[in-house]
């Protein structure tokens, strides 16, 4: 019978919940002095925080070349009309959403088509430049 039990356990593993951890309170005698935090310890902790902030600033300075290339390509002559149509559509949809009967309209315009045209143009412009920079 143990063979079948072992076979079943190997196919269908059983997980057991962990036993609850008992909270053990450490009692301190009433006449024992409490630990005092020295000024040196506080100053050291502040210095560590400043070092962490400097590291974060260094990381933020390195910009993603893809984002900068996308912005540049959006402003090119080839992609400018697509960007213009996309922003016009956004304005039109936003204005339409402010109308009182917008919720009851049968057709609600979105700017997905304009967005995809813009992204297609930007991606065609970015791809060769990005791979040259990454080499």
Curated annotation (Swiss-Prot):
Protein localization: Mitochondrion inner membrane
A cellular-component GO term for this protein: mitochondrial inner membrane
Loss of function: phenotype: Leads to decreased vegetative growth on several carbon sources.
Alphabetized UniProt keyword annotations: Electron transport, Membrane, Mitochondrion, Mitochondrion inner membrane, Respiratory chain, Transport
**Coiled-coil ranges per UniProt:** none
Q: Disordered: where is this region?
A: 1-70
Topology term for the membrane: Peripheral membrane protein
Where is the sequence biased in composition, kind Acidic residues?
19-64
Q: Which InterPro entries match?
A: Cyt_b-c1_6 (IPR003422), Ubol_cytC_Rdtase_hinge_dom (IPR023184), Ubol_cytC_Rdtase_hinge_dom_sf (IPR036811)
The record describes its quaternary structure and partners as:
Component of the ubiquinol-cytochrome c oxidoreductase (cytochrome b-c1 complex, complex III, CIII), a multisubunit enzyme composed of 10 subunits. The complex is composed of 3 respiratory subunits cytochrome b (COB), cytochrome c1 (CYT1) and Rieske protein (RIP1), 2 core protein subunits COR1 and QCR2, and 5 low-molecular weight protein subunits QCR6, QCR7, QCR8, QCR9 and QCR10.
Q: What does this protein do?
A: Component of the ubiquinol-cytochrome c oxidoreductase, a multisubunit transmembrane complex that is part of the mitochondrial electron transport chain which drives oxidative phosphorylation. The complex plays an important role in the uptake of multiple carbon sources present in different host niches.
- Tell me which family the UniProt entry assigns to this protein: Belongs to the UQCRH/QCR6 family.
UniProt name for this protein: Cytochrome b-c1 complex subunit 6, mitochondrial
Give the species: Candida albicans (strain SC5314 / ATCC MYA-2876) (Yeast)
What's the source species' lineage? Eukaryota, Fungi, Dikarya, Ascomycota, Saccharomycotina
């Amino acid at each position: 019978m143990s063979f079948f039990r072992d076979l079943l356990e190997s196919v269908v593993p059983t997980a057991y919940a962990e036993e609850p951890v008992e909270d053990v309170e450490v009692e301190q005698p009433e006449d024992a002095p409490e630990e005092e935090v020295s000024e040196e310890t506080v100053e050291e902790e502040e210095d560590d925080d400043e070092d962490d902030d400097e590291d974060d600033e260094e990381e933020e300075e390195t910009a993603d070349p893809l984002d900068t290339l996308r912005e540049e390509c959006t402003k090119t002559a080839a992609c400018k009309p697509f960007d213009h149509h996309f922003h016009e559509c956004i304005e039109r949809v936003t204005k339409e959403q402010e109308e009182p009967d917008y919720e009851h309209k049968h057709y609600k315009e979105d700017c997905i088509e304009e967005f995809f045209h813009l992204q297609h143009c930007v991606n065609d412009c970015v791809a060769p430049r990005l791979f040259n920079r990454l080499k």
